[in-house]
Each structure stands twice: as C-alpha cells, then as structure tokens.
C-alpha cells in the first residue's frame, strides 16, 4: 500500500539504518481496507457532482462568463483527479501492481488534477477579489477570452508543478513509487513534500485569505441585502478548505521531518503512517464538495441545471429538444453582465451565492 506523499510499500516492516525493523503489517492491512473503501466513495460522489457541473455548463446556450470558465476548469481538474482513484483502489487491494506505463500515467494525471484543482480554487478567489474590490478597474479584464487564457496558463502551471511528483515514478515489482537517481535519493522526496506544502497549500491559503479578507471589508462598506449571506459563504469556503487540507499538509510536513530522523520511535512511525492515510482521504474528499460550494449554490448555475434537466426529460420522452431562455431570463442575463454600483459579486454573474 502507498500514500501519495509517502513512498512506503506493502511490506509489513519498515527498515531504518539506525534502528531495528518496525512492524507495520496491521496498519498496512487497515489501510488496504480503509483507502479502498474511501477512494471508491470519493470517486463515485466526485464523478457525479463534477460531471453535472461540466454537463450543465457545456449544454447551456446562455452566453458564458469568466466565472463559468473557471468553474468548468475546476470541475475538469477534479474529474481528472477522481478518474485516477479506481486505479489507486486497484493498486491498494491488488498484489499485482501496475504496468510501468500505467503507473507513470496514473501518477501524472493524479498530480496534474491535484494541483490544477487547488490552483483553480485560488484563481476563483483572485477573480472574485477583482470583481468586488477592484470592480471599476477590472471589468475590461474579466472577459471570457481572459478566462480562457488564464485557464490555459493554470493548466500549464499545474503540469509544471506536478512534474517533480511523477517524473521519477515507475513500477518496481508490485509497487508504483519514486525511483530516484542515487544523487537525488535523499533530497528529492524532501523537495516533493516541500513543493506540495508550499505550492499546494500554504501559498493558496495566503492568497485566498487575503482576497476574501479584502472582499469582506468591501462588503461591510456597502449596503446590500445579500451582504450577510455572501459573508457567510465566504467564511464557509475558507473554513472548509482549511479544515480539509490542513491536517493532510501537516502530515506531509511531519513525513518530511521523518526523513531527517525526527521520529526514530516505532510507535511514532506507526501513528504517522496511520494518520497520513486518514488525512489523505479527508483531503481528497474535498473534490466532492467543490461542485456544492462553488457551483450548485449559485442561482445562475441552478438555472443551468434546470435547463439541463428539461433537455434530459425531452430526450427520454422522445420529444424535440426546445430549451430556450425566457425574456425575463434574457433580460436578467443582460443585467447580470453590468457592474453594480458598489457591490458586485461577479461582474458577469451578479449572483451573490456564487461568491463562494
């Protein structure tokens, strides 16, 4: 069994140059059951939720906004991420392992989706900061074309950042893990973990905290009946992200310290490995919540879902598909593309609930 930020294998003992063998067979057995069950659950819920987001956004004829572009790419990142989980489930419960190409490809797609999802969440917070705090100056920059260009840049960054995580991965026997050159064996795992901590958590948290803090300041300075709801939703986003990702990143940091011999005691090593498995599953399940807190909560997105539902009903019933926006919705769409005076949640959406 393996966790993604700890190259520890399926053997029942862990060996250390300065200590005796540490028995971890019971933890390996627990992890085999625990990870396989929860990987399957995360896959099922994450697949359904994010597929709904993609279908709703791509099937609507309504003009897209920069918000829609970012939500679509966030859903695609999460889909890429969860698509690898059945392979990891197979890896956890099977004794045969992967083919080398499958090992490398699965690891690559996993980390690209992993970093892509976090980067798009960060970009969404920056976009909201621009739409609300810098509303007057950002309206010309918040176009669909700008969203597409930014999204391509985010994908490129995700691939670049993910590369150190999978470039040395290969299948060795029954295990899919990092096979580092001798000169990098000591430093590369440390660099991987440090990169994950900084670029995958610390930097995004700092950016999100600053953006949403400034947004809340701006909301307090204006008069709007949706202000209280918007602030609650902002706090929900930050708190949920922090609660789901902090324990896992703490364990990655402790795993790094273990590489330097900070946990020579066998019981501490066992506890660390058990905690890493549990917190990893909690962190990964965040992709199941993204559709709920970033898309489904929005009034505009719920309209997308209603139109998608009508299309599906028409197809199932064998009726012609005629789904169009009513005049009131068309007018509302035009109004949503105008920046409100002092309180703009999205210059192209105007939807307070989308301020998540």
Curated annotation (Swiss-Prot):
Q: Which residues cross the membrane?
A: 27-47, 69-89, 106-126, 148-168, 196-216, 233-253, 278-298
Task: Provide the positions where the record notes the PTM Phosphothreonine.
Answer: 347
Q: Which portions of this protein are annotated as coiled-coil regions?
A: none
Instruction: Give me the Cytoplasmic side stretches, as residue ranges.
Output: 48-68, 127-147, 217-232, 299-356
Query: Disulfide connectivity?
Result: 103-176
Q: Which PROSITE patterns match?
A: G_PROTEIN_RECEP_F1_1, G_PROTEIN_RECEP_F1_2
One GO BP annotation is: negative regulation of angiogenesis
Report how it sits in the membrane. Multi-pass membrane protein
Its annotated compartments are:
Cell membrane
Please list the GO terms describing molecular function. C-C chemokine binding; C-C chemokine receptor activity; C-X3-C chemokine binding; C-X3-C chemokine receptor activity; CX3C chemokine receptor binding
Topological domains annotated Extracellular? 1-26, 90-105, 169-195, 254-277
Q: Which domain of life is it from?
A: Eukaryota
Keywords of the record: Adaptive immunity, Cell membrane, Disulfide bond, G-protein coupled receptor, Immunity, Inflammatory response, Innate immunity, Membrane, Phosphoprotein, Receptor, Transducer, Transmembrane, Transmembrane helix
Q: How is it modified after translation?
A: This protein is not N-glycosylated which is unusual for G-protein-coupled receptors.
Recorded GO cellular component terms are: external side of plasma membrane
Kindly state the subunit structure of this protein.
Found in a ternary complex with CX3CL1 and ITGAV:ITGB3 or ITGA4:ITGB1.
- Provide the function of this protein: Receptor for the C-X3-C chemokine fractalkine (CX3CL1) present on many early leukocyte cells; CX3CR1-CX3CL1 signaling exerts distinct functions in different tissue compartments, such as immune response, inflammation, cell adhesion and chemotaxis. CX3CR1-CX3CL1 signaling mediates cell migratory functions. Responsible for the recruitment of natural killer (NK) cells to inflamed tissues. Acts as a regulator of inflammation process leading to atherogenesis by mediating macrophage and monocyte recruitment to inflamed atherosclerotic plaques, promoting cell survival.
Q: Which family does it belong to?
A: Belongs to the G-protein coupled receptor 1 family.
Q: What is this protein called?
A: CX3C chemokine receptor 1
Give the species: Oryctolagus cuniculus
Gene label = CX3CR1
